[in-house]
Amino acid sequence: MFPEVRDLPSGIVDGQNYFAPIDWGDTTLFYMPDRVTWMNADNESFSLMEDPRVKGKVGILDSAADSLFLMMHHLGIDIREKDQLTKAAIDQGIAKFREMRDNGQIRAFFGDTSSMIEALGNEEIDVALGWNEIAWNAGAKMMQPANGTMTWACGLAIVKGADLDKAYAMINGATSAETSAYLLSEWGYGHSNKAGFSTLTADELAERGVAANPATHLSNGMFSVMPSDEVTDYMEAQWAEMVAGG
Protein backbone atom coordinates (compact mmCIF):
# COMPACT_ATOMS: atom_id res chain seq x y z
CA MET A 1 0.00 0.00 0.00
CA PHE A 2 1.22 3.47 -0.84
CA PRO A 3 2.16 5.19 2.46
CA GLU A 4 1.16 8.58 1.02
CA VAL A 5 -2.51 7.61 1.09
CA ARG A 6 -2.30 5.15 3.99
CA ASP A 7 -0.99 7.85 6.31
CA LEU A 8 -3.15 10.81 5.30
CA PRO A 9 -3.38 13.16 8.32
CA SER A 10 -7.17 13.35 8.06
CA GLY A 11 -7.38 9.61 8.73
CA ILE A 12 -5.27 9.61 11.88
CA VAL A 13 -6.73 10.50 15.28
CA ASP A 14 -4.56 10.53 18.40
CA GLY A 15 -1.90 8.56 16.58
CA GLN A 16 -4.30 5.81 15.49
CA ASN A 17 -5.15 5.20 11.84
CA TYR A 18 -8.91 4.96 11.38
CA PHE A 19 -8.96 5.15 7.58
CA ALA A 20 -8.42 2.36 5.05
CA PRO A 21 -7.77 4.22 1.77
CA ILE A 22 -9.22 2.78 -1.42
CA ASP A 23 -9.22 5.06 -4.45
CA TRP A 24 -7.86 8.53 -5.18
CA GLY A 25 -8.20 10.97 -8.02
CA ASP A 26 -9.24 14.47 -9.01
CA THR A 27 -12.16 16.81 -9.27
CA THR A 28 -11.50 19.05 -12.24
CA LEU A 29 -12.88 20.28 -15.55
CA PHE A 30 -13.05 18.09 -18.64
CA TYR A 31 -13.50 19.39 -22.16
CA MET A 32 -13.97 17.93 -25.61
CA PRO A 33 -10.82 18.94 -27.55
CA ASP A 34 -12.52 18.76 -30.94
CA ARG A 35 -15.13 21.31 -29.83
CA VAL A 36 -13.12 23.44 -27.40
CA THR A 37 -10.33 23.91 -29.90
CA TRP A 38 -8.74 26.98 -28.30
CA MET A 39 -7.87 25.14 -25.09
CA ASN A 40 -4.68 23.13 -24.69
CA ALA A 41 -2.23 22.00 -22.01
CA ASP A 42 -0.45 25.36 -22.10
CA ASN A 43 -3.48 27.56 -21.36
CA GLU A 44 -5.81 25.35 -19.32
CA SER A 45 -7.79 27.30 -16.74
CA PHE A 46 -10.91 26.74 -14.68
CA SER A 47 -12.16 30.01 -16.14
CA LEU A 48 -13.27 27.86 -19.09
CA MET A 49 -16.53 27.13 -17.27
CA GLU A 50 -17.30 30.87 -17.46
CA ASP A 51 -16.17 31.29 -21.08
CA PRO A 52 -19.02 32.66 -23.26
CA ARG A 53 -17.88 30.35 -26.07
CA VAL A 54 -19.28 27.41 -24.10
CA LYS A 55 -22.44 29.16 -22.91
CA GLY A 56 -25.14 26.58 -22.32
CA LYS A 57 -22.63 23.78 -22.77
CA VAL A 58 -21.32 23.38 -19.20
CA GLY A 59 -22.29 20.42 -17.04
CA ILE A 60 -21.77 20.56 -13.27
CA LEU A 61 -21.69 17.59 -10.92
CA ASP A 62 -24.43 17.97 -8.30
CA SER A 63 -22.06 17.66 -5.36
CA ALA A 64 -21.20 20.55 -3.07
CA ALA A 65 -18.12 18.77 -1.74
CA ASP A 66 -16.76 18.59 -5.28
CA SER A 67 -18.15 21.36 -7.46
CA LEU A 68 -18.40 24.06 -4.82
CA PHE A 69 -14.91 23.30 -3.51
CA LEU A 70 -13.49 23.50 -7.02
CA MET A 71 -15.23 26.83 -7.54
CA MET A 72 -13.80 28.17 -4.28
CA HIS A 73 -10.36 27.01 -5.38
CA HIS A 74 -10.90 28.83 -8.71
CA LEU A 75 -11.90 31.98 -6.80
CA GLY A 76 -8.66 31.94 -4.81
CA ILE A 77 -9.87 30.40 -1.56
CA ASP A 78 -7.35 27.97 -0.08
CA ILE A 79 -9.42 24.81 0.29
CA ARG A 80 -6.56 23.15 2.19
CA GLU A 81 -7.05 25.51 5.14
CA LYS A 82 -10.06 24.90 7.36
CA ASP A 83 -10.10 28.48 8.64
CA GLN A 84 -10.68 29.73 5.09
CA LEU A 85 -13.72 27.49 4.59
CA THR A 86 -16.19 29.89 6.15
CA LYS A 87 -19.82 30.67 5.45
CA ALA A 88 -18.63 33.76 3.58
CA ALA A 89 -16.46 31.58 1.33
CA ILE A 90 -19.42 29.26 0.73
CA ASP A 91 -21.57 32.28 -0.17
CA GLN A 92 -18.94 33.47 -2.64
CA GLY A 93 -18.87 30.13 -4.45
CA ILE A 94 -22.65 29.76 -4.44
CA ALA A 95 -23.05 33.28 -5.84
CA LYS A 96 -20.78 32.46 -8.79
CA PHE A 97 -22.69 29.28 -9.61
CA ARG A 98 -25.99 31.12 -9.29
CA GLU A 99 -24.69 33.78 -11.67
CA MET A 100 -23.63 31.11 -14.19
CA ARG A 101 -26.96 29.34 -13.82
CA ASP A 102 -29.01 32.48 -14.31
CA ASN A 103 -27.10 33.70 -17.38
CA GLY A 104 -27.50 30.35 -19.12
CA GLN A 105 -23.87 29.28 -18.86
CA ILE A 106 -24.75 25.99 -17.15
CA ARG A 107 -26.66 23.41 -19.14
CA ALA A 108 -27.53 21.24 -16.17
CA PHE A 109 -26.50 19.90 -12.80
CA PHE A 110 -25.89 16.17 -13.15
CA GLY A 111 -26.48 13.66 -10.40
CA ASP A 112 -23.94 11.16 -11.72
CA THR A 113 -20.94 11.03 -14.03
CA SER A 114 -22.54 8.46 -16.36
CA SER A 115 -25.10 11.07 -17.40
CA MET A 116 -22.32 13.61 -17.93
CA ILE A 117 -20.38 11.18 -20.11
CA GLU A 118 -23.49 10.60 -22.21
CA ALA A 119 -24.11 14.36 -22.48
CA LEU A 120 -20.54 14.94 -23.67
CA GLY A 121 -20.90 12.19 -26.24
CA ASN A 122 -24.14 13.51 -27.74
CA GLU A 123 -22.83 17.12 -27.72
CA GLU A 124 -25.34 18.32 -25.14
CA ILE A 125 -22.36 19.71 -23.22
CA ASP A 126 -18.74 20.45 -24.13
CA VAL A 127 -17.36 21.03 -20.62
CA ALA A 128 -17.96 18.96 -17.49
CA LEU A 129 -16.97 19.41 -13.86
CA GLY A 130 -16.46 15.95 -12.41
CA TRP A 131 -14.11 13.03 -11.80
CA ASN A 132 -11.40 11.07 -13.64
CA GLU A 133 -13.60 8.51 -15.37
CA ILE A 134 -15.11 11.25 -17.54
CA ALA A 135 -11.86 11.55 -19.48
CA TRP A 136 -11.46 7.82 -19.88
CA ASN A 137 -15.06 7.09 -20.92
CA ALA A 138 -15.95 10.19 -22.95
CA GLY A 139 -12.70 10.95 -24.75
CA ALA A 140 -12.57 14.31 -22.99
CA LYS A 141 -9.38 16.10 -22.02
CA MET A 142 -8.76 16.17 -18.27
CA MET A 143 -7.76 19.68 -17.27
CA GLN A 144 -4.62 20.02 -15.15
CA PRO A 145 -4.12 23.80 -14.84
CA ALA A 146 -1.12 25.48 -13.29
CA ASN A 147 -2.96 26.19 -10.03
CA GLY A 148 -3.74 22.49 -9.55
CA THR A 149 -6.75 20.21 -9.62
CA MET A 150 -8.71 19.32 -6.50
CA THR A 151 -7.36 15.98 -5.30
CA TRP A 152 -9.21 13.52 -3.10
CA ALA A 153 -8.99 10.05 -1.58
CA CYS A 154 -11.85 7.79 -0.52
CA GLY A 155 -11.74 4.92 1.91
CA LEU A 156 -13.43 2.90 4.61
CA ALA A 157 -13.63 3.13 8.39
CA ILE A 158 -15.11 0.70 10.90
CA VAL A 159 -17.97 2.01 13.00
CA LYS A 160 -18.23 1.18 16.68
CA GLY A 161 -20.05 -2.08 17.26
CA ALA A 162 -19.53 -3.39 13.72
CA ASP A 163 -19.03 -7.07 12.90
CA LEU A 164 -15.24 -7.01 12.60
CA ASP A 165 -14.98 -10.15 10.47
CA LYS A 166 -17.33 -8.71 7.87
CA ALA A 167 -15.72 -5.27 8.08
CA TYR A 168 -12.22 -6.60 7.53
CA ALA A 169 -13.42 -8.83 4.69
CA MET A 170 -14.83 -5.78 2.94
CA ILE A 171 -11.70 -3.73 3.55
CA ASN A 172 -9.47 -6.56 2.32
CA GLY A 173 -11.52 -6.90 -0.85
CA ALA A 174 -11.61 -3.17 -1.50
CA THR A 175 -7.85 -2.81 -1.04
CA SER A 176 -6.91 -5.93 -3.02
CA ALA A 177 -4.69 -6.08 -6.09
CA GLU A 178 -7.69 -7.15 -8.17
CA THR A 179 -9.69 -4.09 -7.11
CA SER A 180 -6.69 -1.88 -7.77
CA ALA A 181 -6.33 -3.18 -11.32
CA TYR A 182 -10.07 -2.84 -11.99
CA LEU A 183 -10.40 0.73 -10.74
CA LEU A 184 -7.33 1.81 -12.69
CA SER A 185 -8.36 0.09 -15.90
CA GLU A 186 -12.12 0.66 -15.95
CA TRP A 187 -12.65 3.82 -13.89
CA GLY A 188 -9.40 5.70 -14.32
CA TYR A 189 -8.91 6.12 -10.58
CA GLY A 190 -5.71 5.68 -8.64
CA HIS A 191 -5.71 3.05 -5.90
CA SER A 192 -3.99 2.57 -2.57
CA ASN A 193 -2.60 -0.84 -3.58
CA LYS A 194 0.54 -0.61 -5.71
CA ALA A 195 -0.11 -3.95 -7.40
CA GLY A 196 -2.68 -2.70 -9.89
CA PHE A 197 -0.30 -0.16 -11.38
CA SER A 198 1.85 -2.88 -12.93
CA THR A 199 -1.11 -3.95 -15.08
CA LEU A 200 -1.09 -0.67 -17.03
CA THR A 201 1.63 1.02 -19.04
CA ALA A 202 2.84 4.54 -18.30
CA ASP A 203 0.91 5.79 -21.34
CA GLU A 204 -2.28 4.10 -20.13
CA LEU A 205 -1.90 5.70 -16.71
CA ALA A 206 -1.30 9.11 -18.30
CA GLU A 207 -4.37 8.61 -20.49
CA ARG A 208 -6.41 8.23 -17.32
CA GLY A 209 -4.83 11.30 -15.73
CA VAL A 210 -3.21 9.21 -13.00
CA ALA A 211 0.42 9.49 -11.95
CA ALA A 212 2.37 6.28 -11.37
CA ASN A 213 2.86 7.26 -7.72
CA PRO A 214 0.28 9.07 -5.58
CA ALA A 215 3.04 11.14 -3.97
CA THR A 216 3.50 12.88 -7.31
CA HIS A 217 -0.22 13.07 -7.96
CA LEU A 218 -1.17 14.42 -4.56
CA SER A 219 1.66 16.95 -4.56
CA ASN A 220 0.38 18.37 -7.86
CA GLY A 221 -3.17 18.78 -6.59
CA MET A 222 -5.03 20.65 -3.89
CA PHE A 223 -5.95 18.14 -1.20
CA SER A 224 -8.96 19.78 0.40
CA VAL A 225 -10.16 19.54 3.98
CA MET A 226 -13.74 19.65 5.20
CA PRO A 227 -15.04 22.68 7.11
CA SER A 228 -16.62 22.51 10.54
CA ASP A 229 -19.89 20.60 10.93
CA GLU A 230 -21.77 23.90 11.15
CA VAL A 231 -20.28 25.20 7.91
CA THR A 232 -20.74 21.83 6.20
CA ASP A 233 -24.45 21.82 7.04
CA TYR A 234 -24.71 25.39 5.79
CA MET A 235 -22.86 24.49 2.59
CA GLU A 236 -25.13 21.54 1.81
CA ALA A 237 -28.27 23.58 2.45
CA GLN A 238 -27.13 26.50 0.30
CA TRP A 239 -26.02 24.18 -2.49
CA ALA A 240 -29.33 22.29 -2.54
CA GLU A 241 -31.26 25.57 -2.66
CA MET A 242 -29.16 26.90 -5.54
CA VAL A 243 -29.41 23.69 -7.59
CA ALA A 244 -33.17 23.69 -7.06
CA GLY A 245 -33.36 27.18 -8.57
CA GLY A 246 -33.33 29.34 -5.46
Task: Locate the predicted segments by residue.
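Periplasmic-binding protein-like
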Residues: 90-100, 136-162, 205-206
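Sec-exported extracytoplasmic/periplasmic mature domains
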Residues: 34, 51-55, 72-77, 98, ...
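A ligand-binding cleft/hinge motif common to bilobed small-molecule-binding domains
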Residues: 121-122, 126-141
